[in-house]
């Protein structure tokens, strides 16, 4: 038997084919989230407060100090926060001390500082009831960077930039005339010597003394002449810098000094952060710069006078290590005193060495180091600036090397804790201004911290970050793997990062430093490729945010590969040679071969075993978790592996999932750390277990209660359902599974099923990657999933009175109300179809002035006779199912609702979706396809033992795509099924072809692993033998039920009157410009006419056509489409007199936009007509009046006569 048995958890044993001993367990896979947030609460938040405070007022008579803070218990539990659409957050109280310096009075007070979202154990946040994740960001590390550039004449020039965490950039560059310039904060350039003079080293001889004599320095000094003898060189330099930074303002040396101090030397305005100081000290340190250079002067111990290194010695690593303590101490330290007019007048300490130029043995080059300022110095120092200039000048002499900005030593990760700290800092600095003003304005005697602190800027900054930042994302909750993957995601986008359009090819490409740190495979296809990455399985962040990866140390003396683990960043790894994890070892731990495959600074080749420093801990340390779940990954093309890794994240949780027969051994750890399962927190014994809760009695007698979630709606509308795994009496240890989560079986990730798959064509139905499927998979609910959708209805106060939830809905028959309770809300368990009422609701209609009788009726019969309209919540199209739950929120019950809302009802509908034609299926190797036909079991091809095949795939999908892993999996899966075992074949260390064939032989299969298949319809065998086996197939989230859509009559857009688009709006299919061309080209005039009129925006025409169709009459001629009227109105709005005439030259009346609204709007030419009309009307009215008077007069006369 090939392979050996490995136990995964308590419920599963797999036969593993790995040959490499694992010396290091995988770290907790979500520690990047949890550790970062913990660090933020422990010391990050405190540091932010200490950065911004103390705050003094403008006259410096009062000061506000930070004392400490305390985080209290969260207001809601996790479950309550989810139900109430609230955030899972804890109140934070900060203690401040207000010191009045005039009276020495001190007031200490605790101030409520808002609610702070708290991370759950799963590494997520609950914000307004939704589960969110803060994605870690990959950004350029602060530090000093050097680059080279070639101009159009082929001349190589150099550039350098000091990039702080926040503050102004300082750049150096040389031009074609070999003059070196500096730029401050992207302004116009000035000779670099101007900045040196401003720092207090004004004489040319001083400049040559510091930097040594080189062409670049000479040319620049010649360019930088003393223009104004009235000013000293330093003052002149300061004025010149001020002119560049503030053009047009009156320049004085004093204002320039304060400006430069504010720009570079004020910790509030300029911050390198700990990582920036570390990177600058590392880059400008003399140790790295002296490496492999020939020293030109003897190095002498300043205390004893002993010669440590003779002149002419090559400074190898061993020589540098022997004098390391002296290099870190006072060796060759020189103190320069700036003149009194300088920006910073403190003495500048530098380390100065002379080496022989690599390009010219007769020349001596000066190396200036920054003498390692303390880690606490977070601003740039004059020593840093001079050392940077020295490094820059050395580059032209062939010393030092330029930086690669895509190297992971120069890119770091801002995890959730740091991102949050930055937001809080932003809020506090906004608050600071506010506090200063209040301190100055109000009466000092009565002030307390509470009165001067306004917490709104801080809470607003935090709220905005969680609610709308690009890095705060709605958790991808399709299945546990997608959750895990989302928590480990690294994004180069977001505030302070790159943008999609600006990111070039280099940033996106795989870099050699990604090895063991970022997965080279798992990244999205499309515009984000390479900008969104995933942490490799063993990746870990150090305190500066650089990704480390573990290696086994090799003892160079004995050649033994030890089990000592060393975590290295990309920078550190560059100094060593690393052997691959699959290098063969002897029993005693030495390398079995003299030559091993290894890497050094990105060069992959064979190296002598005796120069190897480290060895990989595991073959899977290269890839991310999702990629490590693909068996036979080493046999797949990388593009297909990328799709395979991404598609596993889109798997839908099935009703009864199966773990794969052929796994990689990663399934257990992924399920365990995903946060979707229930894991024992302590050792103990199960005393109670059912579907809703499990109770575990600890050894000390205390009781742990674990609640099991049943059919909760996940973020992506799938059923989040946990299943209890333990029974009463079981003994559990810390870390054991108590319940499986969704897409898990026996404590292992189980995204799909293990159907029997045959590679064969069948009636052409699997053309173009389509999948033919047996009806068994439908009947036996093999690929059935449950989906939950949430619908809500709220009642508000309107101007005409409150809306009401009721059973009494106008014009609705009793049969439509049969499942509503007495309140008018659907009962749980009711089966509902499209259009059924879920919540009966009525809204008051506008009422006319009531007559006396109507008012009387109102008084007698109450409000029943009032006019209301039906605004009930109904089941939308495509959403029929069973009512799973109803939640009612009212003010009376103490629920927090939005203002104006009196009651909120949420209805959850569960749908059971079986697999059907049009659903998307996939394997783990990027082999995806759509179900094209579901064939009755009796018609499917069957094996010689009578077992029908479940799925038929097209064999043409394999060769061109080069994902051969699927075929290996197929054969090994069949052997596993026959032997009744589960198999683990870890990536890059899995089953070899010998293992595969020996297992196939052990299972009693044919030597080519193929078989004869019989046609289920005729019983005849097919002509050729077919590859049949078991392949792990998953159903993806792209389901036909979510996409299928049809419309007859539906909503129309207000302005254009054309049908809306999209399934969500119940829209129509767009018949665009090109489609119209097609009909025109065919000359299909009648079809074209009805598409542009009845079926689109001819308002009267479509009504008449609908009426004619329903009454069976002939359809009348179409009218004018609405879009034509829109065109006419647009031309009229441009001031053109546009009218439409029919064939009899009569003007055609067009519908007005607001019927009846613009009766008083008159066309210019119609004004005369209107005037004439008005005059005629007035004349007629006058005549009528006269006639009336005459008749009245006659009548009176007649009456008089009669009397």
Curated annotation (Swiss-Prot):
Write out the biased-composition intervals (Basic and acidic residues).
1174-1195
Q: GO cellular component terms?
A: DNA-directed RNA polymerase complex
Molecular function as annotated in GO:
DNA binding; DNA-directed RNA polymerase activity; ribonucleoside binding
Keyword Transferase set for record = yes
Which PROSITE patterns does the UniProt record give? Answer: RNA_POL_BETA
The record's keywords, sorted A to Z, are: DNA-directed RNA polymerase, Nucleotidyltransferase, Transcription, Transferase
Similarity remark: Belongs to the RNA polymerase beta chain family.
Q: What role is this protein assigned?
A: DNA-dependent RNA polymerase catalyzes the transcription of DNA into RNA using the four ribonucleoside triphosphates as substrates.
Q: Give the record's subunit note.
A: The RNAP catalytic core consists of 2 alpha, 1 beta, 1 beta' and 1 omega subunit. When a sigma factor is associated with the core the holoenzyme is formed, which can initiate transcription.
Q: What is this protein called?
A: DNA-directed RNA polymerase subunit beta
Q: Which gene encodes it?
A: rpoB
